[in-house]
Structures are given as C-alpha cells and as structure tokens.
A protein has these predicted regions:
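Conserved NAD(P)H cofactor-binding loop of Rossmann-fold oxidoreductase domains
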Residues: 1-6, 33-34
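Hydrophobic pocket-lining residues that define ligand/cofactor binding sites across diverse proteins
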Residues: 21-24, 60, 123-127
C-alpha cells in the first residue's frame, strides 16, 4: 500500500490466509488494496492488483467467506523504512536532489493511517451481509507540483524536477458509499500532515536538522 511499493508474494499470502478461514461460515475478510486496479493503463502492478482482488472474490464465493475489498489511496509514514516518504526524505537530505517520476500536474493520492483506522472500525462495526467492494475517494486535490513547492519551503537547497511526459492518472472518484453507509470521509490532508511526517522521520533516524543548509 506504499507508493511505488511492490506486491511480492501477495497472491500466495492471500491463498494461505483464505485457506485458513475455509469452512468457517462466520468468517469475515477485509482485503485492503491500493487504487491501482482502477487505473485505465495496464501495467504489471495493475494486473497483479486486479488478480488479487478477483482471487479474493472467487475464493470467498467458493467457500462462503464474507469478503469485502477496500480500495484506498496510498498510505504514508515517516518511520517505515520502505515507505515512499521515508526514502524521499533520505534522498533529499543526502543528495539534495529529488526527481519525481510523475508529471507536475499529476494529483497525489494518499491517505492518513489515522483516517484508515477510523474507517476500519466503522466497517467492522457495521459489516452487513454479503460481499462488497468499497472505495476511499480522492478528496484532497493537490498536484506533485504543489507538493514540490511545499518541499522547497522545507528544503530550500534541494533541486526538484519532474518527468513531464508521463501519463496522468485519475484518482478514485467519490461514490458517497462510505459517507452514506458509514458516516466516514478522509479528514487529514497529506500537505497539512507533511511537517509531522518529517518530524517522525527525524526522530526515527536521529536527524537533528529540520531544514537542509542553503
């Protein structure tokens, strides 16, 4: 669920997990996945995500396991070493250089862990009958260029560039299901949370400086 993350062993892990629940008619499984299956372009990762979702559906139907699929924007952390932002902060501090693999106009699709935690509580508290596919909408509309401008304020010596000729992907549209059925919507914007993420990173890595020297 991390941006630019991998899915190594995902299908096999799902198979083992679902096999464990086979035969238990009261089992409930919530499979949380990223937005990749909704993208119009086809890549190796989008194919893997779609396959994992379909595997959950088919296995659940075959063995009568209540499966819900929750598609969310990418998660972020300042303390998880494999996270996109942990690596980004390390790069900008050590190299004073960031090259985004996205176009400046590409919107960023991210969700705060605390927002996800609130949603999970509401889903399990009001599970309902049958299987379903739920989608966390993209409600904070800001681009990589705006994000880069925010980073430039934090790291004034950093050189920030973008790939201008890449495909721009749309975010998850709001079907209002989560708001109407669970009374939930994302509350925390990544841009507002960025300073705290960086402080978490500094605490994790014992990095004392809050800004790159000019």
């Amino acid at each position: 669920l991390t941006f630019h993350g991998t899915m190594e062993g995902e299908i096999e892990t799902l198979r083992k997990l679902l096999h464990y629940y086979k035969g238990n008619l009261n089992s409930r499984l919530l499979y949380i996945t990223g937005p990749d299956s909704l993208y119009e372009d086809t890549t190796g990762k989008t194919l893997m995500v779609r396959s994992a979702e379909e595997f959950c559906r088919q296995y659940g139907e075959l063995h009568q396991i209540a499966v819900k699929i929750l598609r969310v924007p990418y998660l972020y952390s300042g303390t998880y070493e494999e996270d996109y932002f942990f690596k980004l902060f390390s790069t900008v501090i050590n190299k004073k250089q960031i090259t985004f693999e996205e176009a400046p106009a590409q919107e960023m699709h991210f969700l705060a862990l605390s927002d996800l935690g609130d949603l999970l509580y509401k889903i399990f508290d009001n599970w309902g009958e049958g299987s379903a596919c739920l989608q966390v909408p993209q409600v904070f509309h800001f681009t990589f260029q705006q994000f880069g401008e925010r980073l430039a304020q934090m790291f004034p010596a950093a050189n920030i560039t973008y790939l201008s000729d890449v495909l721009i992907r749309d975010g998850i549209s709001d079907d209002h299901v989560l708001r109407n059925e669970y009374g939930w919507f994302p509350k925390i914007s990544l841009l507002e949370d960025l300073t705290e993420i960086y402080e978490d990173y500094c605490e994790k890595t014992n990095h004392k400086t809050r800004k790159i020297d000019v």
